[in-house]
Amino acid sequence: MKLALAQIDMRLGDIEGICGRIEDQARLAHERGARVLCVPAPLFMGAMPGGLVGAADFEHDMLAGLTGVAERIQELDMICIVPAAVSFEGQPLLDYMMLKDGHVVPARSSIALQRGENNDTRWAPPVFDVDGVRIAVIFDLDRELEMLPTGVDLIAYFQFNAFDMTDRETAAIAAVRSGAYRKIASKRSVWFACMAPVGAYDESVYTGGSFVLDDCGRVVAQAPCFEESLLVQEIQRGVMLDALEDHELPEFRSEEWLWQALVLAVRDTPGPTVRRAPWWHSRRLA
């Protein structure tokens, strides 16, 4: 089973543009044999998702756009995983939309409703199967790893925390060389894919560097830092694939990452002469 990580940068609030880009990435990934496509967590919700959930028509417009994508890519026989914030029992919930067979399903909230009782079991990461590979989607490594069901083959981790100079793990692949993330894969004997965003959202910046670890904790695929990329990797349990050596991995240097993060922020943030309030501010519910 081939997994695709679409490390793309889009402007927050451009629902039509984001949906069009997801469709384009799905078709490109399909050409390379991918069965599952992941896109970055902030695409639809930025770094502060709660505010968008309260914006009038935002959730409706997002679901309508994604439904159109799901219908148009149905012929590809792919699954797209699109993180998004939704309203659940009166509160914003960090969820992910599963685009499959022409439909859009909010996976976490749908399964939470089925599970009923409000406890840790209710929020254990849902697991789905693609070509015999059991995949669990997680957003919070500290909390959700402890609730991970048995029998998972692949953890698809969507980075949500923006770049922080004091936390090298927010630099994704650049932290692996110093040991970050490896134990998650090797200790549990699972493949680990990190979908790292790139670009500026709200007041935050992401520096890219998506990657895939095999079930021994070795890096078998990496995307570049600070730029867009479509990373496609075959997931094969029990098969020893070629891996990258440590010297082939980027090394986190705080000064370099700070500079590149500033470059991304300047590039993605409108200048004072064209700055406008985000489109949803004028439509936010009281």
Predicted regions: what they are:
Residues 1-36, 264:
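N-terminal glycine-/serine-/threonine-rich phosphate-binding loop
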Residues 4, 97-99, 211, 231-233:
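Conserved hydrophobic/aromatic positions in well-ordered beta-strands
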Residues 27-30, 148-149, 271:
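Non-catalytic positions within long, well-ordered alpha-helices that form the structural scaffold/packing
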Residues 59-81, 143-229:
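CN hydrolase (nitrilase-like) catalytic-core segments centered on the catalytic cysteine
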